[in-house]
Amino acid sequence: IDAIIEDVYVTADDGEFTAKSLTVTTGGSLTVSSDDVVTVVGALENELTSSAVVVENNGVLMQGGTSNLNTGSITVRRNSSAILRQDYTLWSSPVAGQGLYAFSPTTLPNRFYTYNTSTNLYGNSVGFNLTGLQYPSPLVAPNGINGTDTNNVLFATAKGYLIRTPWNHPTAPTVFAGQFAGVPNSGDITYTMSLAGTGFNLVGNPYPSPINMETFVNDNAANITTSLYFWRETNGNTSNNAYCQWNDGLFQSNG
């Protein structure tokens, strides 16, 4: 059925649901609580501000179809692991229209990085890799992404970004609460890969829902290998490999 929300709806209290389409209109709001799933087969239309539809950390907005028919912005919250001041995390956005600097406004503007496939490095002028990463030094990079002020850069769909913690992030392990605002991504998404250099590409989940890794690899078997790599390391920890590896359903930890 087509669902219209005209009052406060919180899945933790009111339950998960599936709808053919979903409209949030005057007087209404939707919160998809942590570990809950809302499934919308077709389009989601939010007639209000992004704060009227919130997908909490570990909450799931699942959609079907091959096209993105969504209109209106929502808020999606995603937490990092417990990280230290000056740690880095790889992020991608589950919505369209989220500003890069607005996502972490107290991170220094020159501490947002893209990955260069041809050099296998992060950064622009003097790059660095993530194997045994401590504090990248020396590091010379323009103020922003590829010379563009970070204030003027939006997350590109399915593209991964390396972002350092805010300058005032605690020195003790603390979760960074990421918040994205924009039109939720849905449907089939195509990302242009590079074959330069080693051929590695930094991509991320573009949806406000999980991706089945085995299905992802099988559906893209003609274009990628069967190995996926996941990076997470704390500054100063050089005892382990920087990347975890998933290969044909087998997972190899870096810990």
Task: Identify the function of each model-found stretch.
Residues 1-255:
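N-terminal exported-region signature
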